[in-house]
Amino acid sequence: MTDKWVPGQGQPMYGSQQPHNLMPPPSGLYQQNSNQSNTSLDQQQQFNQQQYNSQQQYQQQQHSQYQQQQQQHQQQQQQQQQQQQQQQQQQQQQQQQHQQHQQQQQQPQQQSVAQQQPSDYVNFTPRPDLLSKTARDRAHNTTQVISTYYKGIVQHAIERHQRRSAAEASVEQATSEERRNRVLTNYGKKETAYLRMRRTRMALEDFVTVKVIGKGAFGEVRLVQKRDNGKIYAMKTMLKKEMDMKEQWAHVKAERDVLADSDSPWIVSLYFSFQDDLYLYLIMEFLPGGDLMTMLIKYDVFSEDITRFYIAECVLAIEAIHKLGFIHRDIKPDNILIDKTGHIKLSDFGLSTGFHKTHSSAYWKKLKDGTSSNPATQMGPPQNTNRQSTYDSIHLTMRQQISTWRKNRRLMAYSTVGTPDYIAPEIFVHQGYGQECDWWSLGAIMFECLVGWPPFCSEQPRETYHKIINWRETLQFPDDVHLSPESEDLIRRLLTSSENRLGRIGGANEIKSHPFFRGVDWSSIREFNAPFVPKLSSITDTSYFPTDELGDVSEYPQQSSRSDRSSDLPFIGYTFSRFDNMTRRNAI
């Protein structure tokens, strides 16, 4: 039996045969391959370690550089702080030295003054609160007079320079030297006459009264003739005593400012103003055509074409007021005057305001005696008054009420209460209001022109106030009066709440674009023939004014005593004369 070799049991026995395919590998083969692999791995690890070390060194270098930069920046900041501290210390030292120097200079002066002062000298500390009211009022008046005087000098110098420059510019293109000299000579004569007039104190005796043509709550309007040149003017007089009692200082100031600032053909022209101990005087152009109220009383109603003409001109007049920065607040037919060509002009700016502090009664009240304005002088519903009418409005038809209203219409204009028919509701309830309140008045006038009476008229002013405040329920269009859709729409868009009223956002342009004014030439409407042109027999013709209703009046305003002259503070600076109105309107 042959012995077989079994793997793992050692060498086969002697004489046995080993299988050919199980020959062992050559000696040392596995050891050689293992050594080569270990060598390559070691080299790779060394290379990686070198790269890692180099990266660590680079990062350390970057970090050290960053730290150095931070240290340098901190050092710079510390140096700057030290420099600032040094500068502050130097400034403090300089201030201390300057103060010491001043003290050293003052000490000899104080010593010299002390040596000059008598032994019984007593230091005095001003205490204005211990002075009498009369003394304080005189001090206020003196301060106001000085301020007004020097402001006027500066303003007149500026205006004179501007006029001279304008005159020279107008003749730069003159064809001949002769014409240029003639223009400048005429300008010099006008300037001389104007300066002479400014130096002359104007007085009531310079005018002759022709006729009284109007009365108001606080004064009257007279047709006067100037003695030296025979020119005709309208003189408005206001009693200072009444202005004081009714606290109308702000209204007087506002009216004068509007007329002085205006140079519009839609506003009555002011030539000059002055005052004396008793009265304030406004010398204005005379408009012989009367007022719109007289025309409404005479004709009852207007056609839509005539209404369109007058309302369009009123839009332009109100726009001119608003461009000056003022609000009229009392636009009504009484204050719409008609000139000799039949076109309208606005007047009576007693309730206007430019929202300037001097247009506030509270400002003057505080300035005069340190108290708030009297609430009774503010605009608002009147208190209950004795009813003079015996009519019961419940038993009167609308036509009868209008007839009664028309009879008393002019008398109401003369009273101190006035008529509230055209005033916007937001003014009565003391809400905030702006220029849109004048557009409400325009809507009320348009209603009266087309219908024949104001939209909220009543026998008593208090009833009118109530209707205006509740306009949503009381505004009604009569069934027997035909109005075009455009006219009724315009009235409704004017007689509405202030936030929805036409003209609130876009001003006059919104109203101009309304279909009711389609075809109106706004740029040249004053050049067209008016529907009504007054027929005048002379320059003093007053036939269009209700002078018969005024009764007999004296040639001069009534004279009365006025004991408190210290109350003239609000009237300082009232005197006015402007070169433009004195020359361009041929007043000289």
UniProtKB/Swiss-Prot annotation:
Gene3D superfamilies xref list: Phosphorylase Kinase, domain 1, Transferase(Phosphotransferase) domain 1
Active site: 330 (proton acceptor)
EC class: transferase
Residue intervals of the Protein kinase domain: 207-517
Keywords: ATP-binding, Kinase, Nucleotide-binding, Phosphoprotein, Serine/threonine-protein kinase, Transferase
PROSITE patterns recorded: AGC_KINASE_CTER (PS51285), PROTEIN_KINASE_ATP (PS00107), PROTEIN_KINASE_DOM (PS50011), PROTEIN_KINASE_ST (PS00108)
Gene Ontology process terms (BP): budding cell apical bud growth; cellular response to salt stress; cortical actin cytoskeleton organization; establishment or maintenance of actin cytoskeleton polarity; intracellular signal transduction; maintenance of protein location in cell cortex of cell tip; positive regulation of establishment or maintenance of bipolar cell polarity regulating cell shape; positive regulation of exocytosis
Family matches, as InterPro entries: AGC-kinase_C (IPR000961), Kinase-like_dom_sf (IPR011009), Prot_kinase_dom (IPR000719), Protein_kinase_ATP_BS (IPR017441), Rho-assoc_Ser/Thr_Kinase (IPR050839), Ser/Thr_kinase_AS (IPR008271)
Positions of region (Disordered): 1-76, 100-139, 370-389
The protein's role, per its UniProt record: Protein kinase that seems to play a role in the regulation of cell morphogenesis and proliferation.
Similarity comment: Belongs to the protein kinase superfamily. STE Ser/Thr protein kinase family. COT1 subfamily.
UniProt protein name: Serine/threonine-protein kinase CBK1
Organism: Yarrowia lipolytica (strain CLIB 122 / E 150)
